UniProtKB/Swiss-Prot annotation:
The organism of origin for this protein: Synechococcus sp. (strain WH7803)
HAMAP family per the UniProt record, alphabetical: Ribosomal_bL33 (MF_00294)
GO biological process: translation
Lineage, uppermost ranks: Bacteria, Bacillati, Cyanobacteriota, Cyanophyceae, Synechococcales
SUPFAM superfamilies (UniProt xref): Zn-binding ribosomal proteins
GO cellular component, one term: ribonucleoprotein complex
GO molecular function: structural constituent of ribosome
Family according to the record: Belongs to the bacterial ribosomal protein bL33 family.
A Pfam match: Ribosomal_L33
Gene symbol of the encoding locus: rpmG
Keywords: Ribonucleoprotein, Ribosomal protein
Descriptive protein name: Large ribosomal subunit protein bL33
Length: 64
């Protein structure tokens, strides 16, 4: 029997400040992986997480 596709999916969160920074201080882009419930959270996920490149808490948005 085939298994159904689960409701929970793995998404990647990327730092918005590292991605849009124009200065060369940032050596990379901070990324986190997490799971979200497809039925309860249909829009893109936005969480405040620690960015080691900026050394502060920043907003991380879901990417494709």
């Amino acid at each position: 029997m085939a298994k159904n596709k689960g409701v929970r999916i793995v998404v990647t969160l990327e730092c918005t400040e590292c991605r849009s920074s124009t200065e060369k201080r940032s050596q990379g882009v901070s990324r986190y992986t997490t799971e979200k419930n497809r039925r309860n959270t249909t829009e893109r996920l936005e969480l405040k997480k620690f960015c080691p490149h900026d050394n502060k808490m920043t907003i991380h948005k879901e990417i494709k």
